[in-house]
Amino acid sequence: MSILAEKLSSILKRYDELTALLSSAEVISDIKKLTELSKEQSSIEEISIASKEYLSVLENIKENKELLEDKELSELAKEELKILEIQKSDLETAIKQLLIPKDPNDDKNIYLELRAGTGGNEAGIFVGDLFKAYCRYADLKKWRVEIVSSSENSVGGYKEIIALIKGKGVYSRLKFEAGTHRVQRVPETESQGRIHTSAITVAIMPEVDDVEVSINPSDLKIEVFRAGGHGGQCVNTTDSAVRITHLPTNISVSMQDEKSQHKNKDKALKILKARLYEKQIEEQQLANAKDRKEQVGSGDRSERIRTYNYPQNRLSEHRINLTLYSLEEIMLSGNLDEVINPLIAHAQSQFE
């Protein structure tokens, strides 16, 4: 038996053990144990199904090879072996993907943060354009998008947008979007037709609960102030806006979208926890980088990961040297899989 077959047999054995345990009275009466074992079984269910199929194909190959000695059945066995070898190859490819260590955050919802960088108003306009593309992509994936906070500029763009995206596998699909996105195009206000270069930053932060990120209340500085509108005008006569600063890291979050101070505080605290968790992930990635052949990207906001060149209808993904000449179609349709799928494939290849 090959090393792969032995590994798959042990996975199947464990899956059967878990099935038996989950039906035992002892486990059923222990909610904590039941949840723990159910989670473990769920995590190996897909690989178990593929393993069963793969081992069955190996057995069929063995039987058909024995039939090659039979004059009457040898031709039939040859044809059957051709089909089985293709099935074996396809299953091995799928199984290799399933055996790649899963990112524990892959099933989490995310906070998506887009922030205008260099380029003034044009950067702010692109924040809105890219956010719309992400919303269209979310629609295609049947995810839900909820704007948590937004700050508009004077020309219809945004200084910043923070949104909560909920759905199956959100983090697994969008985690590689973190970094600096550069846009090159002719602004509508540009009479000479000159191309301007602007940049925005994207942060992808997994939504976390109190268990994953615990904050000591004494580490927080909470300030309240009146919410302001465009040009500094006051839009609220009460101190409903909230700023929370985590003193050990100096990470700060301000929130004024809600009329209620309590709601603003709750939103700000959730985003603060997500940012602290994001910081932990970045530190882990840097520590683990030595053990990886290459990283798709550090997730660092300062890393320039992609260029959107509108005059050439070109999207360049710098981390994997991918160039697509369908920029406008991708932005309008929201079909970001054209970029995301190659990024995921590249990341997975680093584990092979």
Curated annotation (Swiss-Prot):
Gene Ontology annotations for the cellular component aspect, listed alphabetically: cytoplasm
Cell location: Cytoplasm
Principal location listed in the UniProt entry: cytoplasm
Keyword Methyltransferase among record annotations: no
The entry's keywords: Cytoplasm, Methylation, Protein biosynthesis
Disulfide bonds: none
Basic and acidic residues composition-biased segments: 289-306
Region of interest: Disordered: 288-309
Coiled coil residues, start to end: none
PTM comment text: Methylated by PrmC. Methylation increases the termination efficiency of RF1.
Free-text function comment from the UniProt entry: Peptide chain release factor 1 directs the termination of translation in response to the peptide chain termination codons UAG and UAA.
PANTHER family on file: LD18447P
Family annotation (NCBIfam families): prfA, PRK00591.1
Protein family membership: Belongs to the prokaryotic/mitochondrial release factor family.
Protein name per its UniProtKB record: Peptide chain release factor 1
Source organism (scientific name): Helicobacter pylori (strain HPAG1)
